[in-house]
Amino acid sequence: MAREKFERSKPHVNIGTIGHVDHGKTTLTAAISATLAVYSGSKKDISLIDSAPEEKARGITINTAHVEYETETRHYAHVDCPGHADYVKNMITGAAQMDGGILVVSAADGPMPQTREHILLAKQVGVPHLVVFLNKADQVDDEELLELVELEVQELLENYDFPGDDIPFVSGSALLALQAVEGGPKAKGDDKWVDRIFDLMESVDNYIPAPERDTEKTFLMAVEDVFSITGRGTVATGRIERGILKIGDTIEIVGLKDTQTTTVTGIEMFQKTLDEGMAGDNVGILIRGVQKTDIERGMVLAQPGTISPHKKFEAEVYVLGKDEGGRHTPFFTGYRPQFYVRTIDVTGTIVQFTGDDGSAAEMVMPGDRIKMTAELINPIAIEQGMRFAIREGGRTVGAGVVSKILE
């Protein structure tokens, strides 16, 4: 059977549901999928969402369910994770990138510990925009109570530098909406609970901006291998991470040594020459006036002035539990693992650990999430939001995302 062609007629946005356990994230995901089936004709059953398949990202197993749906103006890919640990791992590894999120809070219970934790994570790992759905509103008879919960959530969002006053809030009942559409598709105006789902998606359409596509960003490619071709010069190979590169462009070689500037004299892919390479292409780039010894795996080629080498940074890290193939014992400040960044392992020291409340921690247990400050022995091209793995003798013991560059 031929695969159905992906129609690229509407702009594509990646979103996800976040929030405390049992506040209704998965039910909401199913309700959105079923409600919007009026536009696309397909919906995903709740039992399929809950039994999410395992995926591997940077050596970590994560359960995530992917659901697609469409509104009148957009195509969405929606990620929902069954367990709290899966959320933490997904957000830190960036296994399913989110351009925005729907924060689900039970109106009957108000914000809970994981509500706070997911907002903090969204801030740290760069989920730029959130919309709030106050679920289980059918269980709240008092309008004032709903307003109180809304104020509480607003305050929580403000604490983590989200614009609480601007963020759209929609209240409703995912369960009642789902039950209503199970009897057949509903148009706007047919059912008050289904209408709340339409309202929610209208807020998502309007408030969460379409992301800048990889090809629109500045050029960057991590070097995987280097060859020299007699009479022509040095070729660096790798996959273009973002942007577009044309013959004749000036680029910088960043990381490990002093930054060098050079000119692109040729671009090849599968033994054919190209005028330009773009995000996603595996290419060989011929560069002028650079010796093979001047460039090595782990450096990056980038548009001049867009990325610089650093040694010290803060990161949000998930440490693998022993049942995930991680360490069996805790590690302490001063621990020296390898940080696997893009294409290279660099040794670094963990200078300090910080808990969510800002208190210093001396040690970290397998299975923990922690904020850490790390210092590498060699400077490499690092930027905020960049993902990495922490390895020890070749096995992954943690995953992280850079939240702040220090020096």
From Swiss-Prot:
<feature type="binding site">
    <location>
        <begin position="19"/>
        <end position="26"/>
    </location>
    <ligand>
        <name>GTP</name>
    </ligand>
</feature>
<dbReference type="InterPro" id="IPR031157">
    <property type="entry name" value="G_TR_CS"/>
</dbReference>
<keyword id="KW-0547">Nucleotide-binding</keyword>
<dbReference type="InterPro" id="IPR009001">
    <property type="entry name" value="Transl_elong_EF1A/Init_IF2_C"/>
</dbReference>
<keyword id="KW-0460">Magnesium</keyword>
<dbReference type="InterPro" id="IPR005225">
    <property type="entry name" value="Small_GTP-bd"/>
</dbReference>
<keyword id="KW-0251">Elongation factor</keyword>
<dbReference type="GO" id="GO:0009507">
    <property type="term" value="C:chloroplast"/>
</dbReference>
<feature type="region of interest" description="G2">
    <location>
        <begin position="59"/>
        <end position="63"/>
    </location>
</feature>
<dbReference type="Pfam" id="PF00009">
    <property type="entry name" value="GTP_EFTU"/>
</dbReference>
<keyword id="KW-0150">Chloroplast</keyword>
<comment type="function">
    <text>GTP hydrolase that promotes the GTP-dependent binding of aminoacyl-tRNA to the A-site of ribosomes during protein biosynthesis.</text>
</comment>
<dbReference type="GO" id="GO:0003924">
    <property type="term" value="F:GTPase activity"/>
</dbReference>
<dbReference type="InterPro" id="IPR027417">
    <property type="entry name" value="P-loop_NTPase"/>
</dbReference>
<feature type="domain" description="tr-type G">
    <location>
        <begin position="10"/>
        <end position="212"/>
    </location>
</feature>
<keyword id="KW-0934">Plastid</keyword>
<dbReference type="InterPro" id="IPR050055">
    <property type="entry name" value="EF-Tu_GTPase"/>
</dbReference>
<dbReference type="InterPro" id="IPR004541">
    <property type="entry name" value="Transl_elong_EFTu/EF1A_bac/org"/>
</dbReference>
<feature type="region of interest" description="G3">
    <location>
        <begin position="80"/>
        <end position="83"/>
    </location>
</feature>
<keyword id="KW-0479">Metal-binding</keyword>
<dbReference type="InterPro" id="IPR041709">
    <property type="entry name" value="EF-Tu_GTP-bd"/>
</dbReference>
<dbReference type="GO" id="GO:0005525">
    <property type="term" value="F:GTP binding"/>
</dbReference>
<keyword id="KW-0342">GTP-binding</keyword>
<keyword id="KW-0378">Hydrolase</keyword>
<comment type="similarity">
    <text>Belongs to the TRAFAC class translation factor GTPase superfamily. Classic translation factor GTPase family. EF-Tu/EF-1A subfamily.</text>
</comment>
<dbReference type="GO" id="GO:0005829">
    <property type="term" value="C:cytosol"/>
</dbReference>
<feature type="region of interest" description="G5">
    <location>
        <begin position="173"/>
        <end position="175"/>
    </location>
</feature>
<feature type="region of interest" description="G1">
    <location>
        <begin position="19"/>
        <end position="26"/>
    </location>
</feature>
<dbReference type="Pfam" id="PF03144">
    <property type="entry name" value="GTP_EFTU_D2"/>
</dbReference>
<protein>
    <recommendedName>
        <fullName>Elongation factor Tu, chloroplastic</fullName>
        <ecNumber>3.6.5.3</ecNumber>
    </recommendedName>
</protein>
<feature type="binding site">
    <location>
        <begin position="80"/>
        <end position="84"/>
    </location>
    <ligand>
        <name>GTP</name>
    </ligand>
</feature>
<dbReference type="InterPro" id="IPR009000">
    <property type="entry name" value="Transl_B-barrel_sf"/>
</dbReference>
<dbReference type="Pfam" id="PF03143">
    <property type="entry name" value="GTP_EFTU_D3"/>
</dbReference>
<feature type="binding site">
    <location>
        <begin position="135"/>
        <end position="138"/>
    </location>
    <ligand>
        <name>GTP</name>
    </ligand>
</feature>
<dbReference type="InterPro" id="IPR004161">
    <property type="entry name" value="EFTu-like_2"/>
</dbReference>
<keyword id="KW-0648">Protein biosynthesis</keyword>
<dbReference type="InterPro" id="IPR004160">
    <property type="entry name" value="Transl_elong_EFTu/EF1A_C"/>
</dbReference>
<dbReference type="InterPro" id="IPR000795">
    <property type="entry name" value="T_Tr_GTP-bd_dom"/>
</dbReference>
<feature type="binding site">
    <location>
        <position position="26"/>
    </location>
    <ligand>
        <name>Mg(2+)</name>
    </ligand>
</feature>
<dbReference type="GO" id="GO:0003746">
    <property type="term" value="F:translation elongation factor activity"/>
</dbReference>
<dbReference type="InterPro" id="IPR033720">
    <property type="entry name" value="EFTU_2"/>
</dbReference>
<feature type="region of interest" description="G4">
    <location>
        <begin position="135"/>
        <end position="138"/>
    </location>
</feature>
